[in-house]
């Protein structure tokens, strides 16, 4: 196997990756006569109950967030597992109690999932069970629409509500990380056991709320990971998730802190990650649940080659070689478009990295690596004036594997089964970095001396192509 391990930090990141994991669950094949198109072992691991025939599949993931954001995770099954196995010790028992003591209303969708679990307890294959639709604006926590069981040993609540706010500083996250690491060793209690379970680690992916103090927390975390890995370098992709950056004329103080947090995080991630993808969560009229579902269209499709079977399979290192082949740096924006296969027009054309605009990026022919996927033949999607031979050679063509239709996404996205996503490095990235560099005002970074500030500016400037 070529496993991928995931770490998520913060509310926005966990919203995005909950959509990601829900999509992965749809690839599970329960009938031994069916042919699996996706190797779910890449991103999932198996846990066993007291009954050796009862198993559950959980993500290869460590989740960091504030306690309230865990809401009501589907932990009933795993509580029994924890009791029988003893868990990881007293440190975890304390953290689990902290989550359970937080009074949170159960979302109707979660109630329905729990009812289904009780009905199908012990059954390997679930029969039909009608689940309610999720109403817009009804989702408070990412756990409200999470379909999967999560291994409670790898849920890490950090008791600091300010971590999810962009009006608090990067330095707060750094301090909270070191406090947390002293109490719960983030390597020994987190990633190390997951790494040791793997046969051959393909890479790591980390999603970070980059405009909040989580940026400081995660930057320190990534340094620890790289120190522990030593010379054993594997692809490490970071998705920096933020809210839209306003123009200087309309920017509020917390928006300025958001830019500052991203600037400091990005400078500190230098050397700790091999690829960086900025992502922007909020689009016009959408709540976080809806906008993160759109981002998942891009993330899930872009990374699909890392887990499919057959000739369309690309490991993370293979994709990195494509991204770096033209010397375009390690920061890339993700542009995508989506539609129903039967439709001639693209229903959604956008950027996952910057504020959504209706622009067909594929016309620019600056794709470094792309993926097109649909439920049928894709050849017609790659023909026409927008794609020359050079562009097509950089695009992975995944046929007969459309985007699944899930009840956990907004209704308007459920019919979109055809997606084209590409990674580019263009003027938008350069402008974004220049804007971040300007945010490094001594008035807001008093914890950094002048020499360090100049070094940070130089690091950011080196990212400009």
Swiss-Prot record:
Residues in the signal sequence: none
UniProt keyword list: Mitochondrion, Phosphoprotein
Compartments where found: Mitochondrion
Molecular function in Gene Ontology: GTPase activity
A GO BP entry: mitochondrion organization
Similarity comment: family membership: Belongs to the misato family.
Recorded GO CC terms: cytoplasm; cytosol; mitochondrion
Functional summary from the UniProt entry: Involved in the partitioning of the mitochondrial organelle and mitochondrial DNA (mtDNA) inheritance.
Pfam families: Misat_Tub_SegII, Tubulin_3
Protein name from the UniProt record: Protein dml1
